[in-house]
């Protein structure tokens, strides 16, 4: 990837220091949060200061390394930790605590389970050596996600151009799957970036993505920063835009891809896939292999996170249409929906797109995997590097 292309940094890391871009404040303010404790990272994940399945997982891994270094200094001074096993126990308990922060995105649990396994089996017999193991593991996860982004970008852009058989393509997407959702460039939006860098992007159409408006606040923000041609549309306009604007492909990200290809992603993705099937527009899912979940047979086994009703019934009084939950007191909230004893609000964060609607294929760092013409459409457990 050429260094000439500068992308936003949602994660700022150097050894011992981790800062996360508070994405609730974008695009009006650019504020980084210091992560100095496990409570800090859990809060950042739960409150969606950091979001996007890959970014959540990487942030958790880096937070573990940063907090471990700080804790080692403090515990040594207080003579609380006396052996390497004392430190290991702290790290394992921290992983368990972070794992519960967001249940639907599989990247977080996969990364933390692997970290726990590596920490448990590490033979280091000093606290300093345990720390070095933790730091090396976290930095390896960080670097791997950047590499995954780059490879997904290249594979996806090349495939879409070949499929469309034209010089410049129109892409439709939902939510935010760019640099703000990953370690560097993005997955679905990374593919759009690559098309733009190569001069092959005609236009991007971005769904606003209610109720947190990740498309309007974040995807459009990334596009404006890099002068990527983009049109923002209401979520309810997806069928109309496919009918009237010559969309060549729909490309979305994922928070979990089950063994059969069923995909959990931002609420509204299922609607998008249904509309794409009707209009015969190829529908692609772009995600790193860390998002693949071969242990969950299908979408029925995915726990769908639900969030507070106020995300739908209230807007931030600070302006800009920012959505905020009760913890986001920096902006204040104003109710814009009538209240009553019989009013209920259903606010699932994700929906499940059946594998049968992923008509284009699944794009990972290993390549593009179209649906099979016979047998199961997808078998995630067999998606391995060629």
Swiss-Prot record:
Checking HAMAP family in the record gives: Salvage_MtnA (MF_01678)
Give the enzyme class.
isomerase
Q: What is its EC number?
A: 5.3.1.23
Q: Which GO terms describe its biological process?
A: L-methionine salvage from methylthioadenosine; translational initiation
Q: Does the keyword ATP-binding apply?
A: no
Domain of life according to the entry: Eukaryota
- Which terms in the GO cellular component ontology are assigned? eukaryotic translation initiation factor 2B complex; nucleus
Q: What family does this chain come from, according to its entry? A: Belongs to the eIF-2B alpha/beta/delta subunits family. MtnA subfamily.
Q: Which reaction does it catalyse?
A: 5-(methylsulfanyl)-alpha-D-ribose 1-phosphate = 5-(methylsulfanyl)-D-ribulose 1-phosphate
Where found in the cell? Cytoplasm; Nucleus
Q: Which residues form the active site?
A: 255 (proton donor)
Annotated pathway: Amino-acid biosynthesis; L-methionine biosynthesis via salvage pathway; L-methionine from S-methyl-5-thio-alpha-D-ribose 1-phosphate: step 1/6
Alphabetical list of InterPro entries matching this protein: IF-2B-related, IF-M1Pi, IF_2B-like_C, Initiation_fac_2B_a/b/d, M1Pi_N, NagB/RpiA_transferase-like
- Which residues are tagged with the site Transition state stabilizer? 175
Species of origin reads: Trypanosoma brucei brucei (strain 927/4 GUTat10.1)
Q: What is this protein called?
A: Methylthioribose-1-phosphate isomerase
Q: What GO molecular functions are on record for this protein? A: GTP binding; S-methyl-5-thioribose-1-phosphate isomerase activity; translation initiation factor activity
Q: What does this protein do?
A: Catalyzes the interconversion of methylthioribose-1-phosphate (MTR-1-P) into methylthioribulose-1-phosphate (MTRu-1-P).
Alphabetically sorted, this entry's keywords are: Amino-acid biosynthesis, Cytoplasm, Isomerase, Methionine biosynthesis, Nucleus
């Amino acid at each position: 990837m050429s260094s000439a292309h500068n992308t936003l940094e949602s994660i700022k890391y150097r050894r011992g220091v981790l800062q996360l871009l508070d994405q609730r404040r974008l695009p009006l303010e650019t504020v980084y949060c210091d992560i100095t404790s496990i409570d800090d990272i859990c809060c950042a994940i739960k409150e969606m200061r950091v979001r996007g399945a890959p970014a959540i997982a990487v942030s958790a891994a880096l937070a573990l390394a940063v907090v471990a270094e700080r804790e080692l200094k403090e515990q040594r001074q207080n003579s609380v930790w006396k052996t390497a096993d004392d430190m290991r126990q702290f790290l394992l308990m921290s992983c368990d605590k972070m794992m519960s922060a967001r249940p639907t995105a599989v990247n977080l649990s996969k990364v933390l389970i692997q970290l726990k396994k590596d920490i448990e089996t590490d033979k280091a017999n000093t606290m300093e050596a345990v720390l070095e193991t933790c730091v090396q593991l976290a930095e390896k996860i960080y670097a791997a996600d950047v590499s995954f982004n780059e490879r997904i970008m290249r594979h996806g852009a090349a495939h879409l151009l070949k499929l469309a058989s034209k010089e410049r393509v129109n892409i439709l997407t939902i939510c935010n799957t760019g640099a703000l959702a990953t370690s560097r460039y993005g997955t679905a939006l990374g593919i759009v970036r690559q098309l733009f860098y190569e001069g092959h992007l005609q236009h991007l159409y971005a769904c606003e993505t209610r109720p947190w408006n990740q498309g309007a606040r974040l995807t459009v923000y990334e596009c404006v920063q890099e002068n990527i041609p983009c049109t923002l549309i209401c979520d309810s306009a997806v069928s109309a835009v496919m009918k009237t604007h010559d969309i060549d492909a729909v490309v979305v990200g994922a928070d979990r891809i089950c063994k059969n290809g069923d995909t959990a992603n931002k609420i509204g993705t299922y609607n998008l896939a249904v509309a794409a099937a009707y209009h015969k527009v190829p529908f692609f899912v772009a995600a790193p292999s860390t998002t693949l979940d071969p242990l969950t047979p299908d979408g029925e086994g995915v726990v769908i996170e639900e969030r507070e009703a106020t995300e739908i019934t209230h807007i931030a009084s600070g302006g800009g249409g920012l959505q905020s939950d009760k913890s986001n007191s920096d902006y204040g909230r104003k109710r814009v929906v009538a209240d009553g004893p019989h009013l209920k609000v259903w606010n699932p964060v994700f929906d499940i797109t059946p594998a049968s609607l992923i008509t284009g294929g699944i794009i990972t760092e290993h390549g593009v995997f179209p649906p099979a013409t016979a047998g199961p459409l997808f078998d995630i457990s067999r998606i391995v590097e060629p």
